[in-house]
Every structure is written in structure tokens, then in C-alpha cells.
Amino acid sequence: VGLGVAKQLGWRATIGLVSAIGIVALAGLALRKASVVPAVPSSSLGQRLRVIGRVDNFLTILVTFFVGVGSLGLYTYIPVVLDRVQVDTIAGMWVWGIGGAVGAFGIGRVLDKVNSSRKLTVTIIALLVTDFALLLLFPSSHVVAVVCLFAWGLLGWSSMAPQQHSMLSANPDEGATAVAVNASANYLGSAVGSAVGGLLLPSSTGILLGALGAVLVGIVCSIGASASSRSHTGDNVN
């Protein structure tokens, strides 16, 4: 919908539409606050630092950060990537978005069936590494480009759920604080990735290499988080 509005009325109209939807949602929450929004006490700075201070938590947060740098940060410059592989910008964003929707709605079912959310995270990031590598290696293949765009959206949008599951499993008494910190790392990674990508413009190769490097660091951190979690608990905690 946003793409259609932007094409007909300009990008400012899309931003206005998003803002209008946000205002309606905020008004709805305000009117039904008592019955819809649970009362969750805010966490103190000490609680947040305690969560971050555990090695397995810190490594998990780093995973989220670096995947955010690579996946969401790269998405900021998707027109540059699409120009490299000679795919129409609107069509490419549709493919990416459909992949993202499939990933966001489908990852819960996958997570319910696997034994370890940490192993699932490693698998997702490994596939994301492969995806970015293929975009670099086959810049003139439309088939590779379309498949990789779909997979990029799917993998990027599905990466958060197993991460949040890992944080909840590792922090049963401070779950709300843990997932909030992890979510913040995702958006911080996106912002940092966007800033770094701007420095690499107009080189699409440089942007893709930067994204690839970020997710490679992410997979190393993910393996470290899994090992640290087992060491911390003495067993295979998800």
C-alpha cells in the first residue's frame, strides 16, 4: 500500500499515511488502556545493566545488533542494490516485502518445532551470509536476484523471534527487560548500518560487502552466545 501511495502521490504521502495510522492506533489504546494494555512496571537502569552484563545475554544482543546493521541497514540502500542487479525498484521491494511477511508470520511455527532457538538463529544468519554472497557473486542474474531478495526479506524478518525466545529462556525473571534491550539493539543496528552505508555510497559492492561483514560477525557472536549459555546453565538451554 505504501509503495502504491508513494508512486501516485509521492513519498511524503506515504509518511503521512503511516503517521495517521499511528495516531488512530494511539487513540484506540488511550480509549481502551485499562482493558487492552497490561500494567508492566518499567525496568530500572540497574536491571538493564544486569541483563546486559551476563556474557550470553551480551553476545545475544550483539547478534541482534550486527544482523540489524547488515539486514535492515542494507535495506536503506536497496535501490542501489537493485540497480546493481538490474531489477525494477518497486518490483524488488515487493519481492523483499513478501519474503519479509512470510518470514514474520512463519517463524513462530518453525520455532515451535525446533529444539534450540540459538541453533535456529545460527542457521538463519548462515543463510543470510549465503544470500548476500550470492548477490555479490551474480550481479547480472535476475533469477538469483529475485530469489535472494525474497530470502533476504524472509531471513531478516524471521531473525528476531528466535533471539527474543533465547533472551526469555535465559532470563525468566527479567524477561520484559531482556526482550526490550534486545529489541533496542535491533533498531540501533539498523541506524548504524544506515549511517555506515551512507559512507560507502555510491558503491553497491561496498554496501553489500559491509552487510556481509556485519552478518559474519553476527554468526560468530551467535555461536559464542550458544556456547556461553551452555556454560552458564550446565545444559542445552534454548
Regions found by a protein language model. Name each.
Residues 117-163:
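C-terminal transmembrane helical hairpin of 12-TM major facilitator-type secondary transporters
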Residues 6, 103-116, 201:
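Helix-to-loop junctions at the C-terminal end of transmembrane segments
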Residues 1, 25, 67, 96, ...:
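Structural signature of transmembrane alpha-helices in multi-pass secondary transporters
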Residues 32-63, 238:
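Juxtamembrane intracellular "pre-TM" segments in multi-pass secondary transporters
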Residues 169-204, 210-213:
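A late C-terminal transmembrane helix in Major Facilitator Superfamily
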